């Protein structure tokens, strides 16, 4: 999946804004948004929030999970656990990047948040690569990759073809070995049932 498509999907996440204008509801393809009342929070798609913010028509309210205490806790849990922590937002990287790049003044401790979110992403990416490597070396048939986001899966796409090719070769080798073993067993069974099968012990 192309990164632009992942961003497009992430931009559909709903986020709160505080508009500085009033307007009746906007009727979009997937439903109405609004009404807009100056000074009152309203949830809109992320793409609309960034568009209005660039026009200085609103202030973006960062999601609750964009908080240093929450993100530091997620970071520590990610480091402790061998599994992937369930993230508070499936598109956390897309949302964080767009909000912080569009409206840094609306995000308390913006640079610190940017750093800890990047740390979380790097830890998860490293864990994902390690999981895939262990999966290959262990000749496994499946890997537990729950709670990954689309962007994280996309980040390891370059090594997936090699991984799948390695697994396919292993499976072909295992199948051939099993077939040869079965043929040898059948051949030995046939020989042992012949008239001279006990000739070595009959002397």
Swiss-Prot record:
Extract the InterPro entries matched here: GINS_A, GINS_bundle-like_dom_sf, GINS_Psf2, PSF2_N
> Could you give one GO CC term from the UniProt record?
CMG complex
State the Pfam families in the record.
Answer: PSF2_N, Sld5
Q: Where is there biased composition of kind Low complexity?
A: 182-203
Q: Which UniProt keywords apply?
A: DNA replication, Nucleus
Primary location: nucleus
This protein's superkingdom? Eukaryota
Q: Which portions of this protein are annotated as coiled-coil regions?
A: none
Q: Where in the cell?
A: Nucleus
Protein family according to the UniProt entry:
Belongs to the GINS2/PSF2 family.
Q: What is the role of this chain?
A: The GINS complex plays an essential role in the initiation of DNA replication.
Q: What is this protein called?
A: Probable DNA replication complex GINS protein PSF2
Query: What species was this sequence derived from?
Result: Drosophila melanogaster
**What lineage, starting at the top, does this entry show?**
Eukaryota, Metazoa, Ecdysozoa, Arthropoda, Hexapoda
């Amino acid at each position: 999946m192309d990164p632009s498509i992942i961003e497009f999907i992430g931009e559909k996440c709903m986020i709160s804004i505080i508009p500085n204008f009033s307007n009746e509801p906007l009727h979009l393809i997937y439903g109405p948004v609004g009404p807009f009342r100056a000074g009152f929070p309203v949830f809109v798609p992320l793409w609309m929030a960034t568009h209005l913010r660039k026009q200085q028509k609103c202030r973006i309210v960062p999601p609750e999970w964009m908080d240093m205490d929450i993100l530091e806790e997620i970071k520590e849990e990610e480091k402790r656990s061998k599994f992937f922590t369930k993230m508070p937002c499936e598109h956390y990287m897309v949302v964080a990047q767009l909000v912080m790049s569009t409206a840094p003044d609306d995000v308390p401790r913006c640079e610190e948040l940017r750093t800890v979110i990047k740390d979380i992403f790097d830890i998860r990416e490293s864990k994902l690569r390690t999981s895939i490597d262990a999966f290959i070396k262990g000749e496994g048939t499946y890997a537990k990759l729950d709670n990954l986001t689309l962007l994280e899966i996309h980040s390891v796409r370059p090594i997936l073809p090699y991984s799948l090719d390695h697994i396919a070769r292993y499976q072909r080798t295992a199948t051939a070995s099993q077939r040869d073993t079965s043929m040898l067993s059948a051949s030995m069974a046939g020989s042992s049932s012949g008239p001279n099968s006990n000739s070595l012990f009959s002397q």
